[in-house]
């Protein structure tokens, strides 16, 4: 036992805690070594206060001055070991805190022994009044519902605790019992405005009330240790109550509050979709109105002057185009059939507004618009008359009878078969032209 004592200073993290309290009889421990041990513990209040999990490094440092300090013959080895621990402690605590965070909901049970076993007897063994004062301050802060600012002043005098609190704040963890979830403290998307400041008070009160109900000493130890499992489980009911009770301020905030609230805690995900929906509804309405007013339903066709002149001339000839007329006109003007059709629809609407009492079935006939009783062939485009020996090629496609009905024949027969008959002036008679208006094929014309 005594042989292992001198080797302890070199291997303090690997030394198991149980053999040390009973390692040898109580020898005349040097006063300097005991004093340095007490001073070292006074300089490291973060060990019991932070409530670290009972790992080797944290157990050997408080237990070493009680039993193993007597077996060490050389006093200079003591401050060396403590200086090394002083340098390494904050990193160890941060890594343990992250392990507790990874545990999730099971973290409170895992952190309970670390809060009860090392933290409770340590103040009695060392007899340090700052620990009792800090416990009283935290209890008062928890009873009064003070936020994280009220619970952090005890850390001002401790350089290690203050550094630890700074690292926790930068990482987004709640230090000193703030009761906030990491995403709520980090503030990734939510702006730090008045609405969030107003919402923090009920959240902290609810979290502290839940923690006091679970148990005063253990809850404070778990909170001081920074194990985020307890903070998250306590903060989730507060977050749900906060979002459900005060939806108004969160809706008015410029940034949507849904995503950070949803990432805060699994318990608060029940109400976050509603908050997201209420916050996004005005945006959807605005985007909907913008899309209705500014969305181009169809690309507006910019007709050239030649296209407009040709379309106007065609409309003067006839207000209704057949399939063949529309196809030929679209091909001649380098337009699509849909563009020609829409232009004629709009032009007919304009014409009806300009001539409210006019008969829509009558052809325009060069702008004059002969009535139903007009002579056959007067409305033919290109000045086509029944006796014209050489009608233009576009005339048969735009041919209409006195009643103004389009010459819709079976398939493309009318368009293709009218050409040979209309090319011979002997066949062109008013009777033949009139018979074509009812869609009869051209090869029936001589028999009629």
From Swiss-Prot:
Bias type Acidic residues, positions: 186-203
One Gene Ontology term from the biological process aspect of the record: cell differentiation
DNA-binding feature ranges: 296-355
CDD domains for the chain: homeodomain (cd00086)
Ranges for region Disordered: 1-80, 115-299, 350-397
Tissue: Expressed in hemopoietic progenitor cells.
InterPro entries in alphabetical order: HD, HD_metazoa, Homeobox_CS, Homeobox_NK-like, Homeodomain-like_sf
A cellular component annotation (GO) from this entry: chromatin
Source organism superkingdom: Eukaryota
Record's compositionally biased regions (Pro residues): 14-30
Bias type Low complexity, positions: 1-13, 62-79, 115-129, 271-280
Gene3D superfamilies with a match to the protein in the record: Homeodomain-like
Function text: May be required for the coordinated crosstalk of factors involved in the maintenance of energy homeostasis, possibly by regulating the transcription of specific factors involved in energy balance.
Protein family (similarity comment): Belongs to the NK-1 homeobox family.
Protein name per its UniProtKB record: NK1 transcription factor-related protein 1
Phylogenetic placement of the source organism: Eukaryota, Metazoa, Chordata, Craniata, Vertebrata
Gene transcribed to yield this protein: NKX1-1
């Amino acid at each position: 036992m005594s042989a292992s004592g001198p080797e302890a200073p070199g291997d303090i993290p690997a030394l198991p805690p149980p053999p040390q309290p009973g390692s040898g009889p109580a020898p005349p421990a040097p006063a300097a070594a005991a004093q340095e041990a007490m001073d070292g513990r006074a300089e490291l209040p973060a060990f019991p206060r932070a409530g670290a999990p009972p790992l080797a490094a944290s157990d050997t440092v408080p237990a070493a001055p009680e039993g193993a300090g007597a077996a060490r013959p050389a006093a200079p080895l003591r401050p060396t070991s403590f200086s090394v621990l002083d340098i390494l402690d904050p990193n160890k605590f941060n890594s343990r805190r992250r392990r507790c965070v990874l545990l999730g909901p099971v973290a409170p049970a895992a952190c309970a022994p670390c809060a009860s076993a090392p933290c409770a007897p340590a103040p009695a063994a060392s007899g340090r009044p700052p620990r009792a004062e800090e416990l009283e301050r935290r209890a008062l802060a928890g009873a009064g519902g003070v936020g994280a600012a009220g619970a952090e002043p005890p850390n001002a005098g401790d350089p290690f605790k203050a550094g630890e609190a700074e690292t926790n704040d930068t990482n987004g963890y709640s230090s000193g019992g703030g009761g906030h979830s990491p995403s709520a403290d980090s503030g990734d998307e939510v702006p730090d405005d008045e609405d969030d400041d107003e919402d923090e008070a009920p959240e902290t009160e609810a979290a502290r009330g839940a923690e006091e109900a679970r148990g005063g000493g253990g809850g404070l130890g778990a909170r001081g240790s920074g194990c985020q499992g307890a903070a998250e489980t306590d903060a989730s009911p507060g977050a749900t109550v906060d979002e459900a009770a005060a939806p108004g301020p969160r809706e008015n905030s410029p940034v949507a509050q849904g995503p950070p609230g949803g990432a805060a805690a699994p318990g608060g995900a029940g109400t976050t979709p509603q908050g997201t929906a209420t916050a996004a509804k005005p945006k959807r309405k605005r985007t909907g109105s913008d899309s209705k007013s500014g969305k181009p339903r169809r690309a507006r066709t910019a007709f050239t002057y030649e296209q407009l002149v040709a379309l106007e001339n065609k409309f003067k000839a006839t207000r209704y185009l057949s399939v063949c007329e529309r196809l030929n006109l679209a091909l001649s003007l380098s337009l699509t059939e849909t563009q020609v059709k829409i232009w004629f629809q709009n032009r007919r609407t304009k014409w009806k507004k300009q001539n409210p009492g006019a008969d829509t079935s009558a052809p325009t006939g060069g702008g004059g618009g002969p009535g139903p009783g007009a002579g056959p062939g007067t409305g033919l485009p290109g000045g086509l008359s029944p006796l014209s020996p050489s009608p233009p090629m576009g005339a048969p496609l735009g041919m209409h009878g006195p009643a103004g009905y389009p010459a819709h024949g079976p398939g493309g027969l009318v368009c293709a078969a009218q050409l040979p008959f209309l090319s011979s002036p002997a066949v062109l008679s008013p009777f033949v032209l009139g018979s074509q208006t009812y869609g009869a094929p051209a090869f029936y014309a001589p028999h009629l």
